[in-house]
Amino acid sequence: AEEMDRADRDRGVPLVRIGGIAGKTDQATREAGILRDLKYHAGLLSLGAMSKAPDDELIAHCKAVAEIFPLVGFYLQPAVGGRALPYSFWRRFAEIENVVAIKMAPFNRYQTLDVVRAIAESGRDDIALYTGNDDNIVMDLLTPHRFVVGPPGPPTPATPHPVPKTSERRIVGGLLGHWSVWTKTAVELLERCKA
């Protein structure tokens, strides 16, 4: 925290402080409290310690941590300690009030789309989506995702053939381990993707 305070003194825009949170609920809630006390902005919650827990237990765990501190969900690929999480998990996760973002790193297009669709269908426009899919960075950043989120309204004289309600979501940035080495170039690439 002291290093970040020093770095912020020389910046026009302050750093966003996201700390890691791990462990089962007792440990994770303690870590969330520490991040809060250190004036971080949010905590990236690893579910690795609960890899065998049923979804109901995972949601209860996430809610307990979110009661203490703003939460960034983390979808980590199974090959490195994560687990497959269905659309239904992410739809319920989106209902947790203090969720501010999700880092998606399942390295699987369909699992990534499950998260994006769950957030789009939840109506939570305040949840930011970040890619951690090192194998698909640029496409994740460039692709708009559009989903039908509601039925069409009744026909009217102005709209005799109403269309279903849709929602578009975009992945707004990358939270990638290797980007910490090439930060300047990564930021330039992100800006080019957004242009």
Task: Give a label for each model feature.
Residues 64-72, 77-195:
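Catalytic alpha/beta core domains of metabolic enzymes, predominantly
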Residues 1-87:
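Active-site beta->alpha loop and helix N-cap motifs at the rims of alpha/beta catalytic domains
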